[in-house]
């Protein structure tokens, strides 16, 4: 989801393995070049506690003015313990942090090898409330105010009104019709390029929802996604959301054994060894929610939570996936 220095875009699967869903009309017939990464399991997350706008650095430096509508271009953690979060994620992924303070709000920019990978916001949870810390996905748009209008027309709720942040761009936070919380961002400097994430960077996003078909239709209307069954030769267990010939995310059914789970987004960090990293999560005070296992695409995934309870995923994915797709 973030810029890389020496990685190339990765290809998708052969075109005979996917098909657009008939119930969701698409405007084009493109094949995907992004490796299809998804998971079957997830955990519920509560609505994020949003902080006041800050003056944040540009998302892309130098500015590229390259835009990829529908791509998850940034993530932010809302946490009640910023120091503990920095200790955990720094120890787990080798992230370094730069503190930014404005208007009484504590914010830390996380970087890996000099490249921004995330933002961390401190927000206390009021006594008596049980809101779970969470990671918030920012999806690229060109016009935040237009996105708000479409989202409301499609049954979404506005949790944080459109607002501009100097150097960063304009953003807003919504809850989709099933209640999953996400943000939209029109970056003033452009979006990160479409390249394979390095270990320690975000590589994939999954929407866990009570109604994948309805959810996919909502996001398709909002971001002009193409929607694909995967795999095409089996009953759809999850849907792929694509734009610009790249898979951007998946929409998956919530596990049947979690009847009280809420719809939510979960983001995955690429790792070299999911088993070792899951053990490291525990050693740093976190928890393993879904044990490492091989998913349908051949990658090894796990779902974990930081010491404050914010869930995220680990995804072990090889560099060798570069199959050419002929249109």
Q: Which residues fall in each region the model found?
A:
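Bacterial N-terminal signal peptides
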Residues: 34-48
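Core segments of cupin and vicinal oxygen chelate
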Residues: 69, 76-115, 153, 159-169, ...
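Short loop/beta submotifs within extracellular cysteine-rich repeat domains
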Residues: 85, 95-97, 116-118, 128, ...
């Amino acid at each position: 989801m973030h810029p890389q220095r020496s990685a190339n875009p990765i290809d998708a699967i052969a075109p005979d393995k996917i098909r657009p869903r008939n119930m969701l009309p698409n405007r084009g017939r493109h094949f995907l070049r992004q490796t299809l990464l998804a998971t079957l399991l997830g955990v519920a997350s509560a609505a994020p506690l949003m902080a006041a706008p800050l003056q944040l650095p540009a998302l892309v430096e130098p500015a590229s003015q390259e835009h990829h509508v529908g791509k998850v271009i940034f993530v932010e953690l809302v946490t009640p313990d910023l120091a503990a979060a920095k200790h955990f994620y720094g120890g787990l992924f080798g992230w370094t942090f730069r503190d930014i303070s404005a208007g009484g709000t504590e914010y830390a920019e996380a970087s890996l090898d000099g490249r921004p990978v995330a933002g961390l916001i401190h927000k206390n949870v009021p006594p008596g409330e049980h809101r779970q810390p969470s990671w918030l996905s920012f999806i690229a748009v060109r016009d935040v105010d237009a996105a708000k209008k479409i989202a409301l027309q499609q049954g979404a709720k506005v949790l944080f009104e459109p607002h501009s942040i100097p150097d960063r761009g304009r953003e807003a936070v919504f809850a989709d019709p099933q209640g999953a919380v996400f943000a939209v961002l029109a970056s003033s400097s452009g979006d990160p390029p479409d390249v394979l994430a390095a270990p320690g960077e975000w590589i994939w996003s999954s929407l866990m929802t009570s109604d994948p078909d309805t959810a996919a239709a909502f996001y398709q209307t909002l971001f002009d996604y193409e929607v694909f069954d995967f795999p095409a030769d089996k009953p759809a267990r999850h849907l792929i959301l694509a734009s610009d010939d790249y898979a951007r995310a998946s929409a998956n059914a919530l596990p049947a054994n979690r009847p009280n789970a809420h719809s939510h987004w979960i983001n995955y960090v690429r790792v070299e060894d999911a088993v070792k990293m899951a053990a490291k999560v525990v050693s740093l005070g976190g928890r393993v929610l879904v044990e490492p296992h091989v998913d349908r695409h051949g990658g090894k995934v796990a779902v974990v939570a930081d010491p404050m309870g914010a869930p995220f995923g680990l995804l072990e994915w090889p560099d060798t996936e570069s199959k050419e797709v002929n249109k």
